[in-house]
Amino acid sequence: MPKMKTCKSARKRYAFTSKGKVKYKKQNLRHILTKKSAKRKRNLGKSGLVSNVEVKRIKTLLPYV
């Protein structure tokens, strides 16, 4: 049976914590930052956690993590 392939786009976007949770970097912090408030930019800089509903789907995209 052939090896399962890792979804390369998912590999770049998600990282697993030691307890098995999935974290990601939030969007909207690349350009057009002048109209965004300091509070919004500060919160966008923090990494977020994926909800438990979507973790199973991400694990199918990343079989060897």
From Swiss-Prot:
PANTHER family linked to this entry: 54S RIBOSOMAL PROTEIN BL35M, LARGE RIBOSOMAL SUBUNIT PROTEIN BL35M
InterPro entries: Ribosomal_bL35 (IPR001706), Ribosomal_bL35-like (IPR021137), Ribosomal_bL35_CS (IPR018265), Ribosomal_bL35_sf (IPR037229)
Any Gene Ontology CC annotation: cytosolic large ribosomal subunit
Keywords in alphabetical order: Ribonucleoprotein, Ribosomal protein
One Gene Ontology biological process: translation
Transmembrane regions: none
PROSITE patterns in alphabetical order: RIBOSOMAL_L35 (PS00936)
Coiled coil: none
Gene3D superfamilies linked: 4.10.410.60
Pfam family, one: Ribosomal_L35p
Molecular function GO labels: structural constituent of ribosome
Protein's name in the database: Large ribosomal subunit protein bL35
Recorded superkingdom: Bacteria
Family named by the database record: Belongs to the bacterial ribosomal protein bL35 family.
